[in-house]
């Protein structure tokens, strides 16, 4: 099994401004799966990075504050966001992530590694029927919808949770292979790991609950939210 870094991660590495970026991998949501760490290490090493990890199984692999704040990029893998959040809080990784963010470390990730930075969103952490998660870190003061085009429950549940005020009135959602750059807490640009048609391909969405109605605006890859 092998993996090559996609455009989004390569762009994140470029944003560090370092010739050899220090990358910290965090795969809590997958139970610190060793195979996933191995293929991730290989991919980032081939890209010229110094790679470390922040594990919690079977015990923390480093002091969270020291490890995360000493990185240029923290990349969080997918899996169970509910388990991720519980374990991060148990081990103080949540506070260390905030310290890293406030110090300018680039934070990113996929699936659970996207949801965790927001207020909450939809998750399969509890089973095949999707449920809300509302206790994410909240660095980004919006709800988040991941796998928006790939799982039939995702879009309608996000809309319903916003109508019911379980989630807030503003969310950002992404189809598979698509991501959103944030500068501080402001959504700026839509990016993708694939060569997709901005008009018809996978996209990002700004979802708003306004005067009792859901208003969803599509942003193709390369678009700006400004």
Residue ranges and their predicted role:
Residues 70, 83-102:
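An acidic, phosphate/nucleotide-engaging active-site surface
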